[in-house]
Curated annotation (Swiss-Prot):
GO terms for cellular component: cytoplasm. Pfam families: RsgA_GTPase (PF03193). The keyword Protease does not apply. The keyword Zinc applies. Its EC number is 3.6.1.-. The gene is rsgA. It comes from Aquifex aeolicus (strain VF5). This is Small ribosomal subunit biogenesis GTPase RsgA. It comes from the Bacteria. Belongs to the TRAFAC class YlqF/YawG GTPase family. RsgA subfamily. GTP binds at N118, K119, I120, D121, G172, P173, S174, G175, V176, G177, K178, S179, S180. It is found in: Cytoplasm. Its cofactor is Zn(2+).
Length: 302
């Protein structure tokens, strides 16, 4: 049977031995049953695009799994188009270093981040000006930034439109309102409230991930990504510079420039000229410093 005769679906539920497949042809979710080489060789995850056939009114036989463009580990979802990094200017207070770490990590996993500032209904005029400054910094760095209030609904329609056709997950610090945003998008709540990079656990932890449809062809995971993460968990010291996307616009004197103390560093010159945000550059230096401190600690243990 050729692929043209098979039907295309998306794995939207993966827990233990249970697989749920959303069939694009009819918008119905079926119980997925792998067979043939898929059964023997392929580890199926939420977010996988699959091909197969409906064998009864409730069952979809999976014949093939498409090659993935990415696979996250928190949560374990394939083919993620956008990670919605939720932040707030206050309650909790914004920490650009934590955001910059998270941006490095998702750049490493080849997932496009979008920064969403929630709780804008709480801001006074001075705070709104500061939010506009943060907006400008991250837009200039090359990121999309949206501003919403999950409480009032302001900006939610724009977020839904922006995410049209994408597979998404939510990430961001504790208390920023990830569950409230998910509820606005889908009418449902997050099953796992937070995930820590240390414990790898959250309240009401589940072993699987469910992708919930919303908007026009969009899906969002009901289990969040990292609430806090250090880039050092994944990225090698020399690679950090490659994940600050605004740095890539500049040509330094030396190809292996670390943008720290080398002469002829175009990145440092750009910081000096105001072309690169001082806050972003300080985050970069702090991440490098974390590496150095970790190496020193390892040497002490040895």
């Amino acid at each position: 049977m050729g692929k043209k005769e098979l039907k295309r679906g998306l794995v939207v539920d993966r827990e233990a031995q249970m697989i749920g497949v959303y069939l694009f042809e009819d918008g119905k979710t079926y119980r997925g049953i792998p067979r043939g080489k898929v059964l023997k060789k392929t580890k199926i995850n939420a977010g996988d695009y699959v091909w197969g056939e409906v064998v009864d009114p409730n069952t979809f036989a999976i014949e093939e799994v498409e090659e993935r463009k990415n696979l996250l580990i928190r949560p374990k979802v394939a083919n993620v188009d956008r990670v919605i990094i939720v932040e707030t200017l206050k309650m909790p207070e914004f920490n650009n270093y934590l955001l910059d770490n998270m941006l490095v990590v998702y750049e490493y996993f080849k997932v496009e981040p979008v920064i969403v500032f929630n709780k804008i209904d709480l801001l006074n005029e001075e705070e709104k000006k500061e939010l506009e400054r943060m907006d400008s910094i991250y837009r200039d760095a090359g990121y999309d930034v949206l501003k919403v209030s999950a409480k009032t609904g302001e900006g939610i329609d724009e977020l839904v439109d922006y995410l049209e056709g994408f597979i998404c997950i939510l990430a961001g610090p504790s208390g920023v309102g990830k569950s409230s945003i998910l509820s606005r998008l889908t009418g449902e709540e997050l099953r796992t409230q937070e995930v820590s990079e240390k414990t790898e656990r959250g309240r009401h932890t589940t072993t699987g991930v469910r992708l919930i449809p919303f908007g026009k062809g969009s899906f969002v995971g009901d289990t969040p990504g990292f609430s806090k993460v250090e880039a050092t968990m994944f990225v090698k010291p020399r690679e950090v510079r490659n994940y600050f996307r605004e740095f890539l616009r500049y040509q330094c004197k030396y190809p292996d420039c670390t943008h720290t103390n080398e002469p002829g560093c175009a990145v440092k010159e750009a910081v000096k000229n105001g072309e690169i945000s001082c806050e972003r550059y300080k985050s970069y230096l702090k991440i490098i410093k974390v590496y150095l401190e970790e190496i020193k600690e390892l040497c002490r243990e040895d």
